[in-house]
Amino acid sequence: MSIEIHASAKNLNLWYDSNQVLHNISLDIYKREVTAFIGPSGCGKSTFLRCFNRMNDFVSNCKIKGELIIENIDVCSVNTNVVLLRAKVGMVFQKPNPFPKSIYDNVAYGPKLHGLAKNKKKLDEIVEKSLTSVGLWEELSDRLKDNAFELSGGQQQRLCIARAIAVKPTMLLMDEPCSALDPFATSVIENLIQNLKKNFTIIVVTHSMKQARKVSDKVAFFESGKLIEYNTTDEIFKNPQSSKTKRYIVDHL
């Protein structure tokens, strides 16, 4: 298991207008591990997740103070190239959101945008490798021209993951990636997350304690915009240090 730090937050605070949503968050995210963010609705876990690729920029009157460093990139700096940041830090949302394009073009869009493929052959290789990584190549290699909306929900979500990794990120953010999926598709995604950590650092927000326990190496528990506890998954579930953490886990298992 890696001990190399991939991202580090120090005294991170965030406001929407005068409402403070995050309070002095400090934690390190380690390379090629899965870190789960858990906590009640409105606790700030998704807001904190969106700090990693500046998705909070789309929220008006959002103000951030503190430090968030990802691979020597000062994420909060006004000088940071946000387009390149979002290529390095991919994101998968709650509901599958494929582009209204073919399966092939969904995956090829990012590499073409960022100039990662010099020719059609190279682009084909990226598409095949990305779809293979999420277990879709064998299922869909003869359907690449089909519209992505024709896929099942689980396939669409895996396609969105393939689209994210096609631009060669080092980190993947997943905001409740299974919340709109059936149990079978959820199991497929959970197994995929465990496999993808061989090549990517993954942060997943989840309301499912079973999912957090299954897929993660470390767990961060949030409440009221504060980081209450952060430890290995085994320690969080077997020996939580905070009574708040213990109560939340017991109530949601």
Swiss-Prot record:
Pfam families reported in the protein's UniProt record: ABC_tran
Subcellular localization, as worded in the UniProt entry: Cell inner membrane
Membrane topology: Peripheral membrane protein
Presence of keyword Cell inner membrane: yes
Record's GO cellular component terms: plasma membrane
Binding residues for ATP: G39, P40, S41, G42, C43, G44, K45, S46
Enzyme Commission numbers on file: 7.3.2.1
Catalytic reaction annotation: phosphate(out) + ATP + H2O = ADP + 2 phosphate(in) + H(+)
Domain ABC transporter as annotated: residue spans: 7-249
Keywords (A to Z) from UniProt: ATP-binding, Cell inner membrane, Cell membrane, Membrane, Nucleotide-binding, Phosphate transport, Translocase, Transport
Domain of life from the UniProt record: Bacteria
Any GO molecular function: ATPase-coupled phosphate ion transmembrane transporter activity
GO biological process: phosphate ion transmembrane transport
InterPro entries hit by this protein: AAA+_ATPase, ABC_transporter-like_ATP-bd, ABC_transporter-like_CS, P-loop_NTPase, PstB-like
Purpose: Part of the ABC transporter complex PstSACB involved in phosphate import. Responsible for energy coupling to the transport system.
Binding partners and assembly: The complex is composed of two ATP-binding proteins (PstB), two transmembrane proteins (PstC and PstA) and a solute-binding protein (PstS).
Protein family according to the UniProt entry: Belongs to the ABC transporter superfamily. Phosphate importer (TC 3.A.1.7) family.
Identification of the protein by name: Phosphate import ATP-binding protein PstB
Organism whose genome encodes this protein: Ehrlichia ruminantium (strain Gardel)
